[in-house]
């Protein structure tokens, strides 16, 4: 497994920045004042560079919602019981969750991935069964996952991305479902980015002040308990992460390895993106951060990464909802690039010198 993982990292190539001048020249020749479409121009520029072409296409999109349970839920860090994770997976499979509505609206296919739910699901056309284990261990008592389990989850995610590329998908989005998963996400941020736990710990599913203080203490305890196992990004992910987070990390790495951009959802998915960036800094050129989460700490994370999310809608649901929304903005930017007339083709006079 380690050899395959190293091969995956080695296969991630830097983007070709030489495309920038050609893409910019085309954008500047469209029938509008230069730069007047603002961030839409930045977004399609990044999309072109990530996909390695000056003639971008975007017709096939997919959202992957990774699900997993967390042993740390036993510490009482969430307002909801752990059994909500499988219940919400069933809701998604039945078409009733927010991500079902928004992925349909975006014209994106949706697949739910069981990475580590503490429940056994029957086969379903929307469900991919990649279960590593029935939930992670309690990270407040020791590592959430072993290195081998973490690598298994990463490689499963990577294989999903590579398969999607082979099926003709051009843009992927991440989502997640897992009760208590803001707790490992916060621990990952604190450890990998050096952010103070108390400043970035949020209310997640809506916990009160007393439980929020308890959540901070649990995260600080988990980091201290696992202090000896935090030497590398992979060890940090294993000790303080979760199966769905590792799966998303793998999806990002796999997509980058085949030159495919990924739209990262909110607070949880961004923690997986941080793990991927720490494992291979090159992947950041393939990432679109979809939205600024309303979850406390996400703004500090985005600032630390130097990232500017596409949307700011006070979202804090997860599931891939923000990513599905942002997919539509990316698609609009590609259509602008491809479908607008140029000054010469439209017979419109350019700017006076």
UniProtKB/Swiss-Prot annotation:
Coiled coil regions, renumbered to chain: none
Keywords from the named record: Cobalamin biosynthesis, Glycosyltransferase, Transferase
MF-aspect GO terms: nicotinate-nucleotide-dimethylbenzimidazole phosphoribosyltransferase activity
Entries under Pfam families matching the protein: DBI_PRT
Pathway: Nucleoside biosynthesis; alpha-ribazole biosynthesis; alpha-ribazole from 5,6-dimethylbenzimidazole: step 1/2
CDD domains the record matches: DMB-PRT_CobT
Catalytic residues in the record: 319
InterPro entries: Nict_dMeBzImd_PRibTrfase, Nict_dMeBzImd_PRibTrfase_bact, Nict_dMeBzImd_PRibTrfase_N, Nict_dMeBzImd_PRibTrfase_sf
Catalyzed chemical reaction(s): 5,6-dimethylbenzimidazole + nicotinate beta-D-ribonucleotide = alpha-ribazole 5'-phosphate + nicotinate + H(+)
GO BP annotations, alphabetical order: cobalamin biosynthetic process
Enzyme nomenclature, EC number: 2.4.2.21
Family: Belongs to the CobT family.
Protein purpose: Catalyzes the synthesis of alpha-ribazole-5'-phosphate from nicotinate mononucleotide (NAMN) and 5,6-dimethylbenzimidazole (DMB).
Protein name as catalogued: Nicotinate-nucleotide--dimethylbenzimidazole phosphoribosyltransferase
């Amino acid at each position: 497994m380690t050899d395959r993982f190293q091969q995956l990292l080695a296969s991630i190539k830097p983007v070709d920045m030489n495309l920038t001048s050609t893409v910019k020249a085309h954008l500047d020749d469209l029938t509008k004042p230069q730069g007047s479409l603002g961030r839409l121009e930045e977004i399609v520029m990044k999309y072109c560079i990530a996909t390695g072409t000056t003639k971008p296409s975007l017709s096939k999109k997919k959202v992957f919602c990774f699900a997993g349970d967390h042993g740390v839920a036993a510490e009482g860090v969430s307002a909801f019981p752990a059994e909500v994770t499988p219940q919400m997976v069933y809701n998604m499979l039945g078409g009733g969750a927010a991500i079902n509505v928004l992925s349909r609206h975006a014209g994106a296919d949706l697949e739910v991935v069981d990475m580590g739910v503490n429940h056994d699901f029957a086969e379903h056309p929307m469900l991919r069964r990649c279960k590593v284990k029935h939930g992670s261990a309690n990270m407040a008592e020791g590592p959430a996952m072993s290195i081998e389990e973490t690598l298994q989850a990463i490689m499963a995610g990577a294989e999903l991305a590579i398969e999607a590329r082979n099926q003709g998908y051009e843009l992927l989005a991440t989502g997640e479902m897992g009760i208590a998963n803001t707790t490992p996400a916060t621990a990952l941020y604190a450890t990998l980015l050096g952010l103070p736990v108390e400043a970035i710990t949020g209310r997640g599913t809506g916990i009160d002040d007393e439980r929020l203080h308890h959540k901070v203490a649990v995260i600080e305890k988990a980091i201290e308990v696992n202090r000896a196992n935090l030497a590398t990004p992979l060890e940090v992910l294993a000790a303080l992460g979760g199966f769905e987070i590792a799966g998303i990390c793998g999806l990002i790495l796999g997509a980058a390895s085949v030159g495919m951009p990924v739209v990262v959802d909110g607070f949880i998915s961004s923690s997986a993106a941080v793990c991927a960036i720490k494992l291979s800094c090159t992947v950041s050129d393939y990432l679109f951060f979809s939205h600024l989460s309303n979850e406390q700490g996400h703004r500090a994370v985005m600032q630390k990464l130097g990232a500017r999310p596409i949307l700011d809608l006070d979202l804090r649901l997860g599931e891939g909802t923000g990513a599905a929304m942002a997919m539509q903005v990316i698609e609009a930017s590609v259509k602008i690039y491809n479908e607008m007339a140029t000054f010469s083709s439209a017979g419109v006079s350019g700017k006076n010198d």
